[in-house]
């Protein structure tokens, strides 16, 4: 399982972005978290290569109808927490 850290910038707070991200995570069998941080949304995502790629593409194309992603930063990470599901915090 690979682990990714994603920071998503743009109109991503107050528009249902975390809710839709959680739905996408369930669709693509992704574990981890999504949360609002300052002026962006932070996502820790764990899954297999294909599922992660599809999930990240869907999220960065705008997870919710009212969101608008201007840019994002993606990096590999090694989260020590053992996730059993995907949560919005």
Swiss-Prot record:
* Record keywords: Hydrolase
The Acylphosphatase-like domain sits at 3-89
Q: What class of enzyme is it?
A: hydrolase
An example GO BP is:
protein maturation
**This protein's record includes keyword ATP-binding:** no
Molecular function as annotated in GO: acylphosphatase activity; carboxyl- or carbamoyltransferase activity; zinc ion binding
Q: Which NCBIfam families match?
A: PRK14431.1
Gene name in the database record:
acyP
Covalent S-S links between cysteines: none
| Keyword Calcium on entry | no
Q: What superkingdom does the record give? A: Bacteria
As for family, the record states:
Belongs to the acylphosphatase family.
Swiss-Prot/TrEMBL catalytic activity: an acyl phosphate + H2O = a carboxylate + phosphate + H(+)
> What is this protein identified as?
Acylphosphatase
Annotated EC = 3.6.1.7
Tell me the active site: 18, 36
Q: Which residues form the signal peptide?
A: none
Q: A Pfam family this protein belongs to? A: Acylphosphatase
């Amino acid at each position: 399982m690979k682990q990714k850290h994603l920071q998503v910038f743009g109109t991503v707070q107050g528009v249902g972005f975390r809710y839709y991200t959680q739905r996408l995570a369930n669709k693509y069998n992704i574990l981890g978290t999504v949360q609002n941080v300052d002026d962006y949304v932070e996502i820790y995502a764990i899954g297999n290569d294909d599922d992660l790629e599809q999930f990240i593409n869907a999220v960065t194309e705008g997870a919710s109808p009212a969101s608008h992603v201007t840019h994002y930063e993606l990096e590999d990470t090694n989260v020590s927490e053992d996730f059993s599901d995907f949560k919005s915090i």
